[in-house]
Amino acid sequence: MSGQDLVTLNVGGRIFTTRPSTLKQFPASRLAGMLDGRDQEFKTVDGQIFVDRDGALFSFILDFLRNHELLLPSDFADHHRLQREALFYELDSLVDLLSQFLLQSRSAVMEVHFLNQNTQAFFRVFGSCSKTIEMLSGRITMFVERPTALTGNRNSPLALPPQRPSHHDLLFHCGSDGAAENQAGVRYISIKPDNRKLANGTNVLGLLVDTLLKEGFHLVSTRTPASGEKSECYVFERITTPQVLGMSKTPKSETTTMPAPSQK
């Protein structure tokens, strides 16, 4: 392979060598424009095209040009800066992928309010993500067992969904509705896939917390009740970040990158 088959770029002091076809993957980009003379901002110095941009982030851009997918380290935190670099190079596909990444990686917050009052326990679950609330609503069932004198059949409890005041919260409660079990109904809570029907508020709280943990949430804070109160609040957070963002187009594998030491 001759030197004419390669292009060397000095991006912010870091040297990258690749094929012209790699830089022309997206013909409308400024990287393609620097090779065909459309973009006069980039100058050739000592056989290298100088680009006054972030060299460390350019390695991710070059990898995207090679494979048409973006693979970032798990601890990568410069998504906005990388998107800014993609905007500079006019790589619209990469800008769109990063916008998708930032949208998908937004954190979801859940608040569980728990009030233990006499023989009943009341729950209110608030979520920033309505889809998570919808998922919980489909898994939580309240079973209302009425006294035998009213129903004649104690073994056929009435199944009810939790209340949905809005798209972002749900309400339910469990326990006995009266001082004596034979005077009023008893509400049990079941949370799928667990088949148990629980009436004790503390047990239901434990099952609800376990359900959220299995869904990828982690507990970030708690608020203990003030003196004379019995309400508690548990705050959970879940951050989902895709590891690989790819385009629908089949990646090309013909490109090669050969980094060289930085020149002073």
Curated annotation (Swiss-Prot):
Localization per Swiss-Prot or TrEMBL: Endoplasmic reticulum
S-S pairs: none
Keyword entries, A-Z: Endoplasmic reticulum
Domain BTB: 5-74
GO BP terms, alphabetized: negative regulation of delayed rectifier potassium channel activity; protein homooligomerization
Signal peptide interval: none
InterPro entries: BTB/POZ_dom, SKP1/BTB/POZ_sf, T1-type_BTB
A Pfam family the protein falls into: BTB_2
A Gene Ontology molecular function term of the record: identical protein binding
Spans traversing the lipid bilayer: none
Highest taxon in the source lineage: Eukaryota
Cellular component annotations (GO), alphabetically ordered: endoplasmic reticulum
Endoplasmic reticulum listed as a keyword: yes
PANTHER family tied to this protein: POTASSIUM CHANNEL REGULATORY PROTEIN, POTASSIUM CHANNEL TETRAMERIZATION DOMAIN-CONTAINING
Annotated function: Inhibits potassium fluxes in cells. May regulate Kv1 family channel proteins by retaining a fraction of channels in endomembranes.
Subunit structure: Can form homooligomers. Interacts with KCNA1 (via cytoplasmic N-terminal domain) and KCNA4.
Name of the featured protein: Potassium channel regulatory protein
Gene: Kcnrg
